[in-house]
């Protein structure tokens, strides 16, 4: 079997109590893992989990939510912990907290503060192929333009439409954004969970399309209960973007449904090979292609 890379994968997880024992059984410790920052957890829990995962060998990318950080002292403490653990990449978001805990009301302010502390971190910023439920397209475009000069990559919100993803990448390229793009796709997860998240994340449009077209039989399957099969979406996106040198890879939203991750990894081995690897990504070795 060839070891040529066919897909570049980053797995998003939440810092749950059993993550350190469950994740290595599902995802190789040489892989890349993005760790969320939820309002009820706070950034400290994200950083602690990221440090612990890094000690196992993972390339960890902690999320830092601007609205959850109390100020410069806490930010510097968090960044120092990450530096000491060898963590060199971050993903910055505004976060879902309604009232900011400190001076950082949006991710642009946090981005500037991190860069003022150290320019050694690679920093990802968010992209929204289907827009944002609380922001206009003009606001999103302006935000991206402001943050891009200090950022290292764009990570897109979860989307169920290869067409919407490709269109978004083309649009930001035309707008002068030449950052590598990690394409956010759902992992194999229950439909009930996806539907409950759809409206909040602003992805209801492509979720409805995926369920309501002739693709339904290929996109949705019944195991013990109805679940989403992301294999076809990943193939379609890969076919569209594999030749783009700034296509960083797939950012897979696992929702900590880790038992299904090995099956997804097996499925990704059927993709046609790409030519380069992005920093902080996991390569999947080549098997005979099924497409």
Where are these regions (language model features)?
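Active-site beta->alpha loop and helix N-cap motifs at the rims of alpha/beta catalytic domains
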Residues: 1-140
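Non-catalytic positions within long, well-ordered alpha-helices that form the structural scaffold/packing
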Residues: 80-83, 147-148, 173, 243
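Charge-patterned, long linear interaction tracts outside catalytic cores
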Residues: 147, 247-263
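Active-site pocket-lining/capping segments in soluble small-molecule metabolic enzymes
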Residues: 11-17, 102-129, 178-242, 256, ...
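Conserved beta-strand positions
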Residues: 35, 92, 125, 156, ...
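Active-site glycine- and acidic-residue-rich loops that bind
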Residues: 69-72, 98-105, 156-169, 189-191, ...
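Conserved, mostly hydrophobic/aromatic
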Residues: 62, 82, 147-150, 183, ...
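Active-site glycine-rich loop that binds ribose-phosphate moieties when present
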Residues: 134-154, 164
């Amino acid at each position: 079997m060839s070891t040529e890379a066919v897909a570049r994968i980053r797995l998003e997880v939440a810092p749950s109590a059993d993550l350190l024992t469950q994740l290595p059984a599902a995802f190789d410790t040489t892989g890349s893992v993005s760790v969320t920052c939820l309002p009820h957890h706070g950034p400290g829990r994200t950083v602690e989990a990221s440090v612990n995962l890094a000690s196992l060998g993972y390339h960890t990318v902690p999320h830092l939510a601007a609205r959850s950080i109390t100020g410069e002292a806490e930010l510097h403490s968090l960044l120092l912990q990450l530096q000491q653990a060898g963590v060199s990449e971050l993903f910055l978001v505004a976060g879902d907290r309604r009232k900011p805990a400190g001076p950082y009301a949006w991710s642009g302010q946090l981005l500037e503060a991190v860069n003022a502390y150290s320019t050694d971190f690679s920093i990802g910023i968010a992209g929204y192929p289907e827009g944002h439920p609380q922001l206009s397209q003009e606001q999103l475009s302006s935000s991206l333009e402001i943050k891009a000069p200090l950022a290292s990559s764009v990570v897109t919100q979860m989307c169920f439409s290869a067409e919407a993803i490709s269109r978004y990448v083309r649009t930001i390229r035309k707008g002068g954004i030449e950052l590598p793009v990690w394409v956010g796709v759902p992992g194999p997860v229950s439909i009930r969970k996806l539907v409950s998240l759809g409206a909040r994340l602003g992805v209801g449009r492509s979720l409805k399309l995926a369920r309501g077209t002739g693709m339904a039989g290929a996109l949705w399957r019944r195991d013990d209960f109805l679940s989403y099969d992301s294999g076809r979406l990943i193939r379609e996106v890969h076919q569209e973007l594999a030749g783009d040198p700034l296509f960083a890879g797939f950012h897979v939203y696992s929702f900590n449904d880790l038992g299904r991750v090995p099956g997804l990894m097996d499925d990704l081995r059927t993709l046609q090979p790409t030519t380069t690897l992005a920093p902080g990504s996991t390569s999947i070795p080549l098997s005979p292609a099924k497409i």
